Amino acid sequence: MLDGKPDTFVYTGDIHAMWLRDSGAQVWPYVQLANNDAQLKEMLEGVIRRQFLCINIDPYANAFNDGPTGGNWMTDLTDMKPELHERKWEIDSLCYPLRLAYQYWKVTGDSSIFDGEWMKAITAILKTFKEQQRKDGVGPYRFQRKTERALDTLNNDGLGAPVKPVGLIVSAFRPSDDATTLQYLVPSNFFAVSSLRKAAEILTEVNKETSLAKECTDLAAEVEAALKKYATYNHPEFGTIYAFEVDGFGNHLLMDDANVPSLLALSLIHI
């Protein structure tokens, strides 16, 4: 419990840190059972509340410590804080909490989670997504790590490969925690569209925040249109397909990744 409310720290298994993606995916199968078990429901509420708290510490971070303990990656060249385990910017880190909170609300009818901490979190999510559209410069995020593994750091002085602002959202890293090659990660942009629309429904029905809800739906529509225009590729054998990554300049990376979201797994996240 934290301030009289459920608080659940879900560590990823082999590392005592809480990834926003992993924690959301780990408890997802239990949501459908929440109405049958009060303790299970309380655990799920605690995960959601902890995720909102984490986002409000730093929306660019992917993994968090259980308190300001510091960790292995405090020497990374980015804006590290002792509460952060790792600060790799991944779009899906902000989508999984929205997906979990929405489904929990739909199953249980419990809207108490959508309080002031939620409002701060969704505001931070919107701000971060818009910053990483990079329409007004490169934004505040940079990341470099002293490593022999190229996929664990970003080139271009910590900014990653250049992109052309076209309405898509940059993801510096993939759900695998590997750096993107071209920074418009297509499956994660689809996840952002779906998650923003879920957030808009919550803001409209629970918080009566129609203006903020419209910001969510407008951004979702912009990203969706950009995906249709810039993320497709005319394959000589298979016709029009979605690329895995693009950069807005016309370059496409044709592959898929094992983690979720991926192109093959879009249906698993209800897209």
Predicted regions and their residues:
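Inter-helical turn/loop segments and adjacent helix faces that build the functional surface
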Residues: 33-38, 104-117, 179, 183, ...
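Acidic/His metal-coordination segments adjacent to aromatic residues that form catalytic metal sites
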Residues: 5-10, 70-88, 150-184, 247-252
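Active-site loop ensemble at the mouth of alpha/beta enzyme cores that anchors a bound cofactor
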Residues: 247-265
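Conserved small/polar residues in nucleotide/adenosyl-binding loops
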Residues: 269-271
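A conserved active-site cap/scaffold subdomain adjacent to cofactor or substrate pockets
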Residues: 187-203, 224, 263
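Acidic, glycine-rich loop-and-beta core segments that form the ion-binding/anion-interacting portion
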Residues: 207-251
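Aromatic-rich carbohydrate-recognition surfaces in CAZymes
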Residues: 16-44, 48-151
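Low-complexity, Ser/Thr/Pro/Gly-enriched N-terminal "stalk/linker" regions
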Residues: 1-21
